[in-house]
């Protein structure tokens, strides 16, 4: 799977980068929209999930993290779409995996913390790479992975309602440049395949059809 029409990051690439970032012991893998949720409620865990079925080739990557200390599930969407927009654009809903995760806990109650700002440009194909960056923050600072940590402070979020605005495109482009520098520093796999990865995930990749 990738993030649509063969663009973006493959599952193999994401797994290799996530390992380089130190997420390996907690990383459950890459999944399509049928991700079952977190079935071991006492263990810190994370995953990268596509909004589409595997049979489609993929559409958009999201990252999930489970912090057992607070029974909290983190959902990171590089676009920061609302639940309604995720359903409208990708036909993706995550209530089922939350319900299954909750049933695995003792009190059957969990908290969802979801990203609401955009860090990725609207025509960018780097969603999978942004998910890797978030998971680095999650495994190193599981109590504050969305912000307030050295990794996610590197990028600047903008209101999702401004995603298409020319005014914020320079900020979103800078985010992607920062993302590439971050991965170049922390991932040997990225360094070895940088040219190909940057070409496949370019800021304007979705215009190159």
From Swiss-Prot:
Its predominant location is virion
Q: How is its activity regulated?
A: Requires DNA and protease cofactor for maximal activation. Inside nascent virions, becomes partially activated by binding to the viral DNA, allowing it to cleave the cofactor that binds to the protease and fully activates it. Actin, like the viral protease cofactor, seems to act as a cofactor in the cleavage of cytokeratin 18 and of actin itself.
**Keyword Cell inner membrane in annotation:** no
Query: Is Disulfide bond one of the keywords UniProt gives this record?
Result: yes
Entry EC no(s): 3.4.22.39
**Which is one Gene Ontology cellular component term of this protein?**
host cell nucleus
**Family in the record:** Belongs to the peptidase C5 family.
Quaternary assembly: Interacts with protease cofactor pVI-C; this interaction is necessary for protease activation.
Its protein name is: Protease
What organism does the UniProt record list as the source?
Answer: Human adenovirus B serotype 3 (HAdV-3)
Gene symbol of the encoding locus: L3
